[in-house]
């Protein structure tokens, strides 16, 4: 974080702003630059080695680690090693189909017995750090490590002995505190939520947008809806309004894994005739 780097980056920021403001190519007459950070924030420096090193393949395969305690969802976003003046592409992105797991073994040192890790120093490869480094993901890591540290203090454990002796119990503690552990079931027999049943007297057939000038969404291109299915969907309604006689094609896809949001496999396809009289 040398003064040169701060001055150089500041010169670039204000140079770009000068161009936006004064080139005449942008509608910026009434715009002002509100704030610029005064400290250089490094996205990557030194990382520790833990019992496991999270790799690019783990992110892309969405590996379901038994010791998962956190998750991420950012793309693998790697910036040019040569810096901002390089003529190479600005970024290299690989986007997983959905969120991925981060194991507990990446969050403590393999050779310093009482050292937890969270944030941008965790045990991941250079490429995997391109996705785990973002703030929302770092927050899940902080919760996992903070809970683990408190658990160790309460039960007189070290990070590695927690993993070896009490990990499942720790996972349940983290889960009960709304820890982001995908696919882990609540095992607490005293949790009343597990004994509850849900009933409904009515169904909602129309959403109030609270917008007086709301209009129908034109289906002049494909539109997708994503909704959870656990364990199955008995049916769904679509409200349509046609201006001409036509055919509406509906396709149903799975996403492959519960946490994904990209169509993976076609389940069924069918068409419905629609006329102006229908609604």
Predicted features along the sequence, with ranges:
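Short edge beta-strand/loop segments characteristic of extracellular beta-sandwich folds
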Residues: 235-241
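Flavin (FAD/FMN)-binding glycine-rich loop and adjacent Rossmann-like elements that form
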Residues: 1-232, 243-278
């Amino acid at each position: 974080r040398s003064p040169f780097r701060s001055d150089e980056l500041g010169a670039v920021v204000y140079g770009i702003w000068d161009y936006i403001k004064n080139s005449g190519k942008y509608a910026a007459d009434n715009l002002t630059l509100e704030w610029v950070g005064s400290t250089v924030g490094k996205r990557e420096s030194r990382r520790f080695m833990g019992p496991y090193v999270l790799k690019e393949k783990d992110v892309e395969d969405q590996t379901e680690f038994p010791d998962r305690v956190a998750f991420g969802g950012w793309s693998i976003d790697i910036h040019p090693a040569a810096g901002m003046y390089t003529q190479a592409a600005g970024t290299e992105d690989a986007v997983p189909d959905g969120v991925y797991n981060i194991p507990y073994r990446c969050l403590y040192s393999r050779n310093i017995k009482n050292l937890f890790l969270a944030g941008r120093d965790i045990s991941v490869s250079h490429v995997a750090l391109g996705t785990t480094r973002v703030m929302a993901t770092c927050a899940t890591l902080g919760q996992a490590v903070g809970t683990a540290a408190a658990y160790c203090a309460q039960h007189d454990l070290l990070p590695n002995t927690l993993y070896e002796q009490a990990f499942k119990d720790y996972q349940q503690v983290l889960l009960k505190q709304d820890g982001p552990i995908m696919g882990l079931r609540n095992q607490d027999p005293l949790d009343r939520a597990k004994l509850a049943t849900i009933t409904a007297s009515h169904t909602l057939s129309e959403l109030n947008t609270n917008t007086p000038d709301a209009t129908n969404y034109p289906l002049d291109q494909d539109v997708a809806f994503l909704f959870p299915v656990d364990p199955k969907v008995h049916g769904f309604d679509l409200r349509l309004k046609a201006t001409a006689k036509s055919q509406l094609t509906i396709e149903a896809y799975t996403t492959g894994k519960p946490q994904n949001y990209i169509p993976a496999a076609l389940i069924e396809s069918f068409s419905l005739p629609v006329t102006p009289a229908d609604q």
